[in-house]
């Protein structure tokens, strides 16, 4: 097992040197130097220095053979593989591509301890070629955080970022899309869960999820988006715009209800594929997105296509024919632009089954209201099958397989037809038999956050935990399902130290200090709210989740109050740590189950166990270190029927 975030293969000697201000950096790309110097505590001045760091594109036979002999590996040939050779005369990074050199810079950062690096040889190579995140566009206020998040993904050596556009980017040819998008999102944000009421309970037809969090209900200028794309590409990310089409495209019809498949729907989400005007609008949108992103591939959505053959133009047509013809039209248009096509793959699947809902994906589906409530709902119609389209669309359409949790064999329906797949909506900590699936041909995986792009939501949706856990799957060739507990604990540690790098520069004490740099409260609660994903218009409400306050009091009567928020900076004492295994799953049932409330607070806190209870270490940077700290008090809100248990308070100096 690899210990810590370091290259998997690393031979160290007893001696070493320091990366200091005297160390020169010889790099073919400014981003390599910038990346090295951007991380805190990679340099330590006043010590025996490495004379230089050299980045070299290409691997000499001598260096390649040294890797083979040192680690019993084949000769390095992966373009993302990188070698870090550390010697008295300098640090030498070798790779076959510029992206590989970039990951070499990341490996140096991972290996350095207070600027020190022992002599030796390190080698790292990914397990899979596609390692990504799917996100919404940020709002303007979150653009800086977006870049910080990209830097975090780079630290964990991700190489793909899929960004859903929808109505959240300026359209110069169709400003009505943006104008109506703002109104629509404001309407949907009236209260948490309004979108779910509209989607599941309001209409006698099936509706798509409403992505009103995209851009935080606003839109970015094309120049702003270009800036974000450039930032990603400088760090060697492939940026894939996601342009929902056919279904999930409410943004197109907000200003153009005349192209809706269901004209009477006040919130239409599916255009009529028999109406030429649908493609005139869609292709205008694609043209502007292609100009801004300059992409190699576009994800055109096509997931959860529900409103099938319902308008007068489409009635009588086979669902599979409609679905395939729409994909082919868009595929042909993108091919003329030298852009590849990707889709979500659920509507190509014949045998997907959702527990308590019945057939799903591309099967013929009996529809109920409330939506998918087979046991309690009222039958309202039949959704035509689309799975036969798998025989009609071009084989180089790239497939995002996101129904992996319903049945491990579902992917075979796509692979056996000759398509390439990568897993979507990926949750590595729940994914079984990773190595076996890669051998079958998967290109990798993409984790999804279907909500606002900010730190709190990403944490509470377990995105941070998921991306750090999946790092072990993406870069550790010895990854095994049986190592879950070890990787879980390492992941919790990774995130905590990544989020609080300054703590490593201070000494921790359980004795109260007058002028601490940080105060760390180890606590937990018996408060309980069932875990939920904050997606599709469901957002955390403070009146539900705030259960108390941390009060810092100083001798001059100054006070500082920090809210205690369940699921954000505190968790329950009874949280479950183990992953349970369903040895005989029924169709659609997952093999693994976990308690997400352990991971929901990872990043801002470090969960730990003590006497069969769980506590959460939550650091607070002292807002007034120059003042004398008198008291640290943990208070419970009077209207909350719960207790907050304090295990210990630590001080850093």
Task: List each language-model region with its residue ranges.
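Acidic, contiguous N-terminal accessory segments
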Residues: 1-124, 343-352, 358-388, 395, ...
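Charged, glycine/proline-rich intrinsically disordered loops and linkers
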Residues: 174-215, 355-387, 594-599
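Active-site neighborhood of glycoside hydrolase catalytic domains
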Residues: 269-419
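Beta-sandwich interaction modules
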Residues: 506-516, 526-529, 535-541, 546-548, ...
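Feature activates predominantly on carbohydrate-active enzymes
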Residues: 3, 8, 77-335, 342
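Flexible, acidic glycine-rich loops studded with aromatic residues
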Residues: 149, 391, 406-506
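Active-site beta-loop-alpha junctions enriched in small/polar residues
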Residues: 136-138, 166-168, 244-248, 303-305, ...
């Amino acid at each position: 097992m690899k210990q810590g975030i370091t290259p998997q293969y690393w031979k160290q000697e007893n001696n070493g040197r320091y990366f200091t201000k005297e160390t020169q950096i010889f790099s073919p790309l400014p981003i390599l130097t910038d990346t090295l110097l951007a991380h805190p505590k990679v340099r330590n001045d006043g010590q025996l220095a490495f004379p230089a760091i050299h980045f070299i594109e290409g691997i000499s036979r001598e260096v390649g053979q040294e890797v083979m002999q040192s680690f019993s590996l084949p000769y390095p040939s992966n373009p993302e593989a990188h070698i870090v050779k550390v010697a008295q005369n300098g640090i030498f990074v070798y790779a076959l591509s510029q992206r590989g050199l970039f990951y070499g810079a990341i490996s140096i950062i991972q290996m350095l301890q207070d600027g020190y690096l022992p002599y030796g040889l390190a080698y790292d190579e990914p397990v899979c070629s596609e390692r990504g995140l799917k996100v919404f566009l940020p709002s303007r206020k979150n653009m800086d955080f977006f870049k910080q998040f990209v830097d975090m993904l780079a630290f964990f050596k991700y190489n793909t970022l899929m960004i859903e556009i929808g109505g959240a980017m300026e359209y110069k040819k169709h400003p009505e899309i943006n104008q109506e998008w703002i109104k629509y999102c404001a309407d949907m944000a009236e209260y948490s869960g309004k979108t779910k009421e509209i989607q599941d309970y309001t209409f006698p037809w099936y509706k798509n999820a409403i992505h009103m969090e995209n851009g935080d209900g606003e839109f970015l200028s094309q120049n702003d988006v270009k800036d974000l794309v450039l930032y990603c590409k400088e760090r060697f990310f492939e940026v894939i715009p996601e342009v929902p089409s056919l279904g999930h495209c409410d943004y197109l019809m907000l200003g153009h209800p005349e192209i809706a498949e269901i004209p009477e729907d006040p919130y239409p989400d599916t255009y009529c594929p028999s109406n030429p005007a649908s493609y005139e609008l869609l292709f205008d949108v694609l043209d502007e997105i292609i100009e801004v992103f300059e992409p190699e591939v576009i994800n055109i959505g096509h997931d959860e296509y529900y409103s099938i053959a319902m308008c007068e133009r489409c009635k009588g047509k086979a669902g599979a024919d409609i679905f395939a013809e729409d994909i082919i039209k868009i595929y042909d248009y993108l091919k003329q632009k030298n852009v590849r096509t990707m889709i979500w793959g659920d509507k190509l699947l014949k045998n997907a089954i959702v527990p308590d809902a019945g057939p799903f994906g591309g099967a013929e589906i009996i529809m109920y209201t409330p939506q998918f409530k087979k046991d309690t709902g009222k039958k309202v119609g039949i959704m035509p099958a689309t799975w036969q389209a798998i025989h009609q669309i071009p084989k180089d359409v790239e497939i995002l397989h996101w129904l992996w949790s319903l049945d491990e064999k579902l992917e075979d329906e796509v692979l056996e037809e000759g398509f390439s797949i990568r897993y979507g909506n990926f949750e590595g900590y729940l994914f079984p038999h990773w190595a076996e699936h890669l051998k079958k041909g998967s290109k990798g995986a993409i984790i999804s956050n279907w909500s606002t792009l900010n730190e709190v939501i990403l944490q509470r949706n377990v995105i941070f935990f998921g991306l750090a856990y999946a790092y072990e799957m993406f870069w550790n060739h010895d990854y095994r399902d049986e190592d879950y507990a070890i990787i879980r604990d390492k992941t919790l540690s990774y995130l905590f130290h990544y989020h609080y790098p300054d703590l490593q520069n201070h000494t921790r004490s359980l004795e109260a200090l007058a002028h601490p740099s940080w105060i760390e409260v180890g606590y937990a609660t018996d408060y309980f709210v069932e875990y939920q994903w904050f997606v599709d218009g469901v957002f955390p409400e403070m009146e539900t989740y705030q259960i108390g306050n941390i009060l810092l009091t100083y001798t001059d009567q100054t006070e500082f109050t920090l809210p205690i928020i369940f699921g954000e900076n505190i968790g329950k004492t009874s949280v479950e740590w183990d992953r349970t295994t369903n040895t005989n799953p029924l169709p659609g049932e997952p093999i693994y189950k976990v308690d997400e409330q352990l991971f929901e607070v990872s990043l801002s806190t470090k969960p730990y166990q003590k006497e069969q209870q769980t506590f959460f270490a939550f650091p607070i940077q002292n807002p007034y270190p120059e003042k004398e700290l008198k008291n640290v008090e943990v208070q419970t809100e009077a209207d909350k029927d719960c207790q907050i248990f304090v295990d210990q308070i630590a001080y850093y100096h």
